Amino acid sequence: MDERPVLFFDSGIGGLTVLREVRSLIPEKQFIYVADDVGFPYGNWEENVLKNRILKIFTNLLTVYNPALCVIACNTVSTLMIADLRERFPHILFVGTVPAIKLAAEQTKSGFISVLATPGTVKRTYTHELINSFAGQCHVQLVGSEKLAGFAENYLRGQSVDLEELRNEILPCFVKKNGKHTDIIVLACTHYPFLLHFFREQALWHVQWIDPSKAIAKRTRSLLPQRIHHQTVKKYEDFALFTSQNITSSTKRLLKEFSLNITKGVDFKV
């Protein structure tokens, strides 16, 4: 069996929603979670500057850890440069996290779907290509929130969420027109599932919320060699790397719940 680790990458701790699902399918693998929290949030970065930063980080990561596969657990990075990563590192398997627009278009009954994302994901050409390819017959509302990813990070650090502000961020997702209304909202940021119970509480009406984490987990498992013997005991511990030194006690507790040992202040030579 290939004993190389599976690497997860995000700007913060939102990608833990994806790690949780992948780990449930292949618990025997070693997982390395990388959070470039110095760069958080990625949604407001200038594109070329962010691309250069990510490429430098991955040049370092892949040299040091030689993973079997990398999960880009960040919609902003995936929609911006998954093709660039595959081209630069052709020997590495990459699984991206992109808006589940195809699935939403297949499941909507009203034809009205919304994509709740970051500003970066909303403006990406990749996102609009997904809509044109799979949801051309649908009314697709793109909503780029500048605040929700930060709300999720703060919530996971034990801080309270301003529900009125959260409600204002999701209100544009709820569209009524010609007797029809939104029936599906795509969560297009890996941070957002951590806020899902708040979204449901503040929703204007009942909708289906699509979290792509399970689909990403299945895709990841399909790309890795299947174990011959049903090994479930890890040989190596999982761990997390953070680029900042500022890891709060609540974040440490969260990572402990995910059985991740922490190394902070990692310098990726960016």
Curated annotation (Swiss-Prot):
Enzyme class, UniProt record, top EC level: isomerase
User: What pathway annotation does it carry?
Assistant: Cell wall biogenesis; peptidoglycan biosynthesis
**Similarity-based family:** Belongs to the aspartate/glutamate racemases family.
Give the EC number: 5.1.1.3
Q: Which organism is this protein's natural source?
A: Bartonella henselae (strain ATCC 49882 / DSM 28221 / CCUG 30454 / Houston 1) (Rochalimaea henselae)
Q: What is the lineage of its organism?
A: Bacteria, Pseudomonadati, Pseudomonadota, Alphaproteobacteria, Hyphomicrobiales
Q: Name one GO biological process term.
A: regulation of cell shape
Q: Output the Gene Ontology terms for molecular function.
A: glutamate racemase activity
Q: Which UniProt keywords apply?
A: Cell shape, Cell wall biogenesis/degradation, Isomerase, Peptidoglycan synthesis
Record has Cell wall biogenesis/degradation as a keyword: yes
Residues recorded as binding substrate, renumbered to this chain, are: D10, S11, Y42, G43, N75, T76, T190, H191
This protein is called what? Glutamate racemase
Q: Which residues form the active site?
A: C74, C189
Provide the reaction this enzyme catalyses.
L-glutamate = D-glutamate
| SUPFAM superfamilies to which the protein is assigned, alphabetical | Aspartate/glutamate racemase (SSF53681)
Identify the domain of life: Bacteria
What job does the chain carry out? Provides the (R)-glutamate required for cell wall biosynthesis.
- Pfam assignment, any one: Asp_Glu_race
